[in-house]
């Protein structure tokens, strides 16, 4: 569940311009494969034009999310990752 979102700085590009990311605070319900500790935040680009993902915030919609962890353990998601609302999955 995505609880909240905010725009954060993620360093600078090669020209010194700040790189923005959307930081989603999430409530992890279950981990199928990944680190032992709960994921608290997921990062994505700020627009779908640069492969950013938009999640419903407020904690009502549950998602199955497959993303990538960077070297610092931060979880990142893009449009190419598997991200579907939980209630659309079949058994």
Swiss-Prot record:
Q: Does the keyword Secreted apply?
A: yes
Q: List locations, semicolon-separated.
A: Secreted
Give the CC-aspect GO terms.
Answer: extracellular matrix; extracellular space
Q: Name one GO biological process term.
A: response to cytokine
InterPro entries from the UniProt entry:
Netrin_domain, TIMP, TIMP-like_OB-fold
Question: Which Pfam families did the record assign?
Answer: TIMP
What this protein is reported to do is described as: Complexes with metalloproteinases (such as collagenases) and irreversibly inactivates them.
Q: NTR domain spans which residues?
A: 1-91
Identify this protein by name.
Metalloproteinase inhibitor 2
Phylogenetic classification of the source organism: Eukaryota, Metazoa, Chordata, Craniata, Vertebrata
Q: Name one GO molecular function term.
A: metalloendopeptidase inhibitor activity
Its family remark reads: Belongs to the protease inhibitor I35 (TIMP) family.
């Amino acid at each position: 569940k995505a609880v909240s979102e905010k725009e954060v700085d993620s360093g600078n590009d090669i020209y010194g311009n700040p790189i923005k990311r959307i930081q989603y605070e999430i409530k992890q319900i279950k981990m199928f494969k990944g680190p032992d500790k709960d994921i608290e935040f997921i990062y994505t680009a700020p627009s779908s034009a640069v492969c950013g993902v938009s999640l419903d915030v407020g904690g009502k919609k549950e998602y199955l999310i497959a993303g990538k962890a960077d070297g610092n353990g931060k979880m990142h998601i893009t449009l190419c990752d598997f991200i579907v609302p939980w209630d659309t999955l079949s058994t």
